[in-house]
Amino acid sequence: MTFPVEKVRADFPILQREVNGLPLAYLDSAASAQKPNQVIDAESAFYRHGYAAVHRGIHTLSAQATESMENVRKQASRFINARSAEELVFVRGTTEGINLVANSWGTENIRAGDNIIISEMEHHANIVPWQMLCERKGAELRVIPLHPDGTLRLETLAALFDDRTRLLAITHVSNVLGTENPLPDMIALARQHGAKVLVDGAQAVMHHAVDVQALDCDFYVFSGHKLYGPTGIGILYVKEVLLQEMPPWEGGGSMISTVSLTQGTTWAKAPWRFEAGTPNTGGIIGLGAAIDYVTSLGLDKIGDYEQMLMRYALEQLAQVPDITLYGPAQRLGVIAFNLGKHHAYDVGSFLDNYGIAVRTGHHCAMPLMAWYGVPAMCRASLAMYNTHEEVDRLVVGLTRIHRLLG
């Protein structure tokens, strides 16, 4: 069956607008995806008709809001095939989820002389928390290098592990190159050395199904806003045996069992002890609607359509004069490129004049930029609502820029 892209586009009101007098071609979903009516309406309805503070409220609105919030936890658990909803922590996004692991599990389990392995393609959110932890603890941060095609040099990975390796923290899909890393092989190698595994799934969950049990990772984290949901909400999955042992890293309301000025404080059980303060309940409701939305379309169908569009885009972009494409032939979601020696910001500004939205800069991946020897790249990302026509507009726009700038 043909993917109903026009029907999908009709669900996203922002796609009907114009930019600089031209129809918007939104090719920046890897930074943040647009929101369908179903998500907007669900969050709006909650604030209009169902809002109340969750937890401990005896009145109807509070009880209903709490139930709705916990139902989304169960729904997200099914979405990634966790064993239990109580393995999922609501966080503000991928960045907070990784910081939670670093400051809770990491503080308890990393010692001087230990090491953590990351890769050269990581987003800053999966670099900086580990740098900070290693500096605090006197541990070593080891880095998996890249091949020129944007895949990891996996032949070097085994030598990076030793009996002091405590964690492999790896992106599922690169936010710049679109590289999908071979997680089963990497996780199996980590297991041989007794290391835990954290997966940054921010660029994966919208493109295909994720099964955390099949992966056998210890931590998996993703953001709602890249999954067509609201900003300020994400999911951290932690294997139950680890989560129950982890101490809280933020204190306040909701995460306690008892508080005494003379006898100290005891914690709520996990996952609630990691959710201090008033939660983003509206965002949680919106995340549930986003999961419903992509599930109703079918992640397999979304993935097939996006891969067809990706192949077309790579073929067409390769014909643009003086373009450099970065990353492997087989990729998910994103195409990073530069045009001649022109700065990415200049190219992106011209494209914006043509109504085309792309991301420019270092994409929170400065070590990757340094590896390629460039200060910045343009990045076009392809989502389920993008079309062949929008790809054609990008190609025409870049060809026009090349003619204008040389």
Swiss-Prot record:
Give yes or no: UniProt keyword Cytoplasm: yes
Give the cofactors, semicolon-separated: pyridoxal 5'-phosphate
N6-(pyridoxal phosphate)lysine: modified positions: K226
A GO molecular-function descriptor? pyridoxal phosphate binding
Record-annotated disulphide pairs: none
| Residues the record marks as active site | C364 (cysteine persulfide intermediate)
Respond yes or no to whether keyword Cytoplasm is given for this record: yes
- InterPro entries, alphabetized: Aminotrans_V_dom (IPR000192), Aminotrans_V_PyrdxlP_BS (IPR020578), Cys_dSase_SufS (IPR010970), PyrdxlP-dep_Trfase (IPR015424), PyrdxlP-dep_Trfase_major (IPR015421), PyrdxlP-dep_Trfase_small (IPR015422)
Q: Which keywords, in A-to-Z order, does the entry hold?
A: Cytoplasm, Lyase, Pyridoxal phosphate, Transferase
Q: Highest taxon of the source?
A: Bacteria
According to its UniProt record, where is this protein located? Cytoplasm
What Pfam families does this protein map onto?
Aminotran_5
Q: What is its EC number?
A: 2.8.1.7, 4.4.1.16
Part of which pathway? Answer: Cofactor biosynthesis; iron-sulfur cluster biosynthesis
**Any one Gene Ontology BP term:** cysteine metabolic process
What reaction(s) does this enzyme catalyze? Answer: (sulfur carrier)-H + L-cysteine = (sulfur carrier)-SH + L-alanine; L-selenocysteine + AH2 = hydrogenselenide + L-alanine + A + H(+)
- GO CC annotation: what is one? cytoplasm
- Name the predominant localization: cytoplasm
Regarding protein family, the annotation reads:
Belongs to the class-V pyridoxal-phosphate-dependent aminotransferase family. Csd subfamily.
Q: Which NCBIfam families match?
A: PRK09295.1, sufS
Functional note: Cysteine desulfurases mobilize the sulfur from L-cysteine to yield L-alanine, an essential step in sulfur metabolism for biosynthesis of a variety of sulfur-containing biomolecules. Component of the suf operon, which is activated and required under specific conditions such as oxidative stress and iron limitation. Acts as a potent selenocysteine lyase in vitro, that mobilizes selenium from L-selenocysteine. Selenocysteine lyase activity is however unsure in vivo.
This protein's assembly is summarised as:
Homodimer. Interacts with SufE and the SufBCD complex composed of SufB, SufC and SufD. The interaction with SufE is required to mediate the direct transfer of the sulfur atom from the S-sulfanylcysteine.
Q: Output this protein's name.
A: Cysteine desulfurase
Q: Which organism is it from?
A: Salmonella schwarzengrund (strain CVM19633)
